[in-house]
Every structure is written in structure tokens, then in C-alpha cells.
């Protein structure tokens, strides 16, 4: 019973924050495709990118939007449909009590709006996650290290453990636009 009740609490959050974007994207997609032009902006969250205590459902939905953005951008590229994500920091009911009032006062919608407008403009990038916080703007990227290749017969948990520092060496990290680890490069 507890699991069923928990799922009932989780579902509306997923419906609003993930499925709402899926449904809206499906509604506009054929029109954008026919026009040979379109812009879609997903609203992700630091809870989806970095995690946050007590927000598993919300964080999962917001992380799901990044996957949705990536797939829709690939599918829409040939029709100049550009899909991006905005990661705003704003003073909301969810952030009340988490930060001092002086900080919340800086987290205005007006400081986020320019980023949103850029991401849907004619000059919008493609497949970009843009963070907007109190007048600060930064690109958020998913990176992959160069990693290591283990030949067949050496692919064991122990071999991975022995080379884990090398696998995780961020000095070799690169921004990836498509999948492909060390074995595929």
C-alpha cells in the first residue's frame, strides 16, 4: 500500500514536468516540421542536473527533459528545429527557506528572461543547456573522459578498479554530442 501511495504522489510531478513537455512538443512538432523552422525550449533544473535532497521525482523529470532535448534536436535538425534547455535559478515556493532573503531577491524572472529569449531566437544554438542565475549565464555540458580500453579477457571489475583514476581523469574530458566511448573512438 505504501508503494502504491508513493507512486500516486510521484506521478503528478512526472506528468507535469516531463510528460507536459512531451505532449506540448508533440503538438507543435508537425507544424514546425512543415514550416521548416521551429524552436523548443525545455526548462530543466539544478535538481535534475546535480540532484537535490528530497526531490527525486522532480529531479528525475527535469533530467528526463535533457534526454528529450537531445533526441528532439537530432530528429529536428534537418527541419531547422532547434531544441535547447534553460536551467533557471529563481525565487519560488520551492526555494523559500533554502536561501537568505538577500539571495532570493537576486533570483528574479527578469534575470532569466534574456537567456530564454536567446534560446528561442533565430540565432539560437542547438542542443544547449544554459544556466541562468541572478545575471550569471553559463553553459552546462555533459562530458566524457578519454577513459581506457580493456581488451577482451581483461574486462573485469578488478581491472576497472585498478585503472579507475585513469578512467575518471577529467583532464582528458571532452564535450560529447553523440555516444561513443574509448572503444568506439
Question: Which role does the model predict for each range below?
Answer:
Residues 3-22, 37, 41, 65:
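Catalytic Tyr-X3-Lys loop
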Amino acid at each position: 500500500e505504501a508503494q502504491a501511495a508513493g507512486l500516486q504522489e510521484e506521478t503528478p510531478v512526472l506528468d507535469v514536468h516531463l510528460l507536459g513537455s512531451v505532449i506540448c512538443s508533440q503538438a507543435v512538432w508537425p507544424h514546425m516540421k512543415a514550416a521548416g523552422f521551429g524552436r523548443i525550449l525545455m526548462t530543466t533544473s539544478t535538481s535534475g542536473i546535480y540532484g537535490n535532497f528530497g526531490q527525486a521525482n522532480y529531479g528525475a523529470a527535469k533530467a528526463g527533459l535533457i534526454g528529450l532535448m537531445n533526441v528532439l534536436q537530432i530528429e529536428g535538425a534537418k527541419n531547422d528545429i532547434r531544441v535547447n534547455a534553460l536551467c533557471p535559478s529563481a525565487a519560488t515556493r520551492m526555494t523559500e527557506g533554502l536561501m537568505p532573503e538577500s539571495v532570493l531577491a537576486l533570483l528574479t524572472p527578469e534575470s532569466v528572461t534574456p537567456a530564454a529569449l536567446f534560446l528561442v531566437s533565430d540565432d539560437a544554438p542547438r542542443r544547449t543547456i544554459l544556466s541562468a542565475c541572478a545575471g550569471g549565464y553559463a553553459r552546462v555540458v555533459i562530458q566524457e573522459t578519454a577513459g581506457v580500453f580493456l581488451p577482451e579477457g581483461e574486462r573485469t571489475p578488478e581491472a576497472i578498479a585498478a585503472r579507475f583514476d585513469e578512467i575518471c581523469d577529467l583532464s582528458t574530458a571532452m564535450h560529447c554530442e553523440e555516444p561513443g566511448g574509448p572503444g568506439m573512438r
